[in-house]
Structures are given as structure tokens and as C-alpha cells.
Amino acid sequence: MFSEKYRHLLDGIELADSIGMDFHKMLLAPSVTSAVLFKKGKDAYRTFTQDAEYLLRAEENEDPWHDVARRSFECTKTMLSLKVFSIVTTHGWEIFDQSVTKLIDLAAAFAGLIDASDDFELALRPQANILCFRFTDADGDLSEANAAIRKAVVARGEFYIVQTSFNGETWLRTTISNPMSTSEHFGSLLDYIRKLAKAC
């Protein structure tokens, strides 16, 4: 949506009645910065309608844009949009294009490193900034080996990855969210996993 190069990945998004966005994943905002965008603004009120006489006093025809209690489960909510506003005011909208494009390109570069190795494999080709992969040069069950590797990686604190299940098997999962990352970082992670795999 923000990247000219990768806009085609969201073909058809204009047909959605609403979309959820996590600005902290690819759009340089601190965690947690999320939004639900509605094609028809009034749908936000219908989705989270609640009945609280002491809070919700707007007349039926009034548009209470300022009353977030009508659009969420929480009555008191941090103004998350201020984080996005600050980024746009400081850097302009084009910063989002640059970030999204760079992060997807970085994921493709990381996937290339995995493809070029003979001891890792991808679960599937990344379409955005998330990769699922696993170490394959392990004795015994690969799911157990990769779960042990993930635990060892996190315990040492140099890198942070999670694990996920895909087709009943355990895979390592990483989200690339820092556009300053480089192929050297990804190579270091793979080497680190190789080293830890010997100890697991």
C-alpha cells in the first residue's frame, strides 16, 4: 500500500470494508502502533457499539469523532495516531515507501542467503518482511532440533527469533523491521544458528 514497487501485493485491498495495520511492523513506529481503517467511517461505531449511559451522550445524528469509547473496547486509549503523525510530519509520507520497499528487499536478500546454503531451507518464499526457515543439518527430528536452537538463540540474547508451526513442523521465524539491517546481519544469524546447533 505504501510501496510503489510492491503495491501489486495488495491488489484488491480497495474491496475490503476495513483493514488492520500495525505501523510498528514496517512503518518505523514504536510498538504498539496499530490502526483499523474503515472504508465507511461510521462502520467503526457499529463494530464496537457499547451502551454506557454515563459516558456516551452524543445525540443520534451527531458525529462524535472525538469519542474513542464509541469505537473501541477501551474507554481510555493512548492516542496511537500521534506516533504516525510525528513520523509523517518529520519525514513525509515517502518515508513509508522507502521503509516498506527496503524491508521487503531485505527479506528477499535473506531468502537468497538461505537458498544458497545447504543447511537451511525456507518454508515458503517471503512475500513481505517475514521469513520462516529452519536448520536442516541436524540429527534426529528437525522440529525438535529447531525448537532447541530457537531456545538457545533467545537465551543468549544476541539475536531474537520466534518459532512457528507450518504443516505440523517447527520452523524458525523472523520479522525484519529495521531498514538498517544488512545481509551481513542475516549471515551472522545463520552462522550463529550453525554454531548453536552443534551444542543442542
Please state what every model-predicted region is:
Residues K25, T90-W93, D137-D139, N178-T182:
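A generic structural motif
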Residues L122-V153:
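Conserved PLP-binding catalytic core of the aspartate aminotransferase-like
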Residues F2-K5, L9-S117:
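Active-site C-terminal subdomain of aminotransferase-like
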Residues E121-P126, I161-S165:
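Short beta-strand
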Residues S86-I87, C132-F135, L172-S177:
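Short, hydrophobic beta-strand segments
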Residues F166-C200:
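PLP-dependent enzyme catalytic core of the Aspartate aminotransferase-like
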Residues D115, F120-E121, S143, L189-Y192:
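Non-catalytic, mobile gating and regulatory segments of ester bond hydrolases
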